[in-house]
Amino acid sequence: ATMAVRNVLVTGCSSGIGLALAVRLARDELKRFRVFATMRNLEKSEALKEQAGPALDKMLEIKDLDVTSEDSIRRCVNSIPQRRVDVLVNNAGFGLIGPVESQSMASIQHLFDTNFFGLVRLIQEIFPDMKRRKTGHIVVMSSVLGLQGLLFNDIYSASKFAVEGFCESLALQALKFGIRISLIEPGPVLSEFERKLYEEAASLDLSGVDKETLDIFHNFYLAYSKEVFTALGQSPEEVAEVG
């Protein structure tokens, strides 16, 4: 018997790992995956369309999904035949670097709203269906910073520690229902994610930050981390292989 095609919902597909993974699954030679590639802003879907090539509209469908909105998540899941999500890939997220006293509470809460609460909202919507069907796979893009902290990544690292604790706890329940939960913990990845990170760091208001901290941030952290990204950075495609 032929294996049933699995419905895969991927979040954060406008660039980086989400885009690479959606394309890789959609172009699977055995056509085992129907991919619902989602993003918050459909105007950013050009790169995905281009790379999906012939798989577009056959094995890959692009949908609008904002992980910070329950309504948006529900609409997206309701638009999938029988609401059947066999594999959920939670990938939407962004980083934040800099001295913690220079971050606004609004930007800190926005990061958690996406990186952590976004995952929680998706689970609330999709997990009960998976439990009913007694099958499913949840793949969560975490980070090596969900395992250990890093200078000037306090808030981002905290959001990933939250993701890790949530998933480790949920996995214990999921096992009883035949559902797998996988945490992927990449190190540095060279992508749009990293480019945006440095761009935003450059525009931080650092006027209230002491000289010593600024010195560590600019002359040590930024200089060093750029080198690390360049020397050790993986491509999004390499990370997609793991999935």
Give residue ranges: language-model regions:
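C-terminal beta-strand-loop-alpha-helix "lid" module of Rossmann-like NAD(P)-dependent dehydrogenases
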Residues: F177-F229
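Active-site helix of classical SDR
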Residues: I123, S159-A162
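Conserved glycine-rich Rossmann-like NAD(P)H-binding loop of the short-chain dehydrogenase/reductase
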Residues: R27-A47
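Conserved Rossmann-fold cofactor-binding substructure of NAD(P)-dependent oxidoreductases
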Residues: T68-R83
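Residue(s) in the substrate-gating loop at a strand-loop-helix junction
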Residues: S143
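N-terminal Rossmann NAD(P)H-binding glycine-rich loop of SDR-like oxidoreductase domains
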Residues: S14-G16, A22
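Substrate-binding pocket helix/loop in short-chain dehydrogenase/reductase
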Residues: P99-V100, S107-Q109
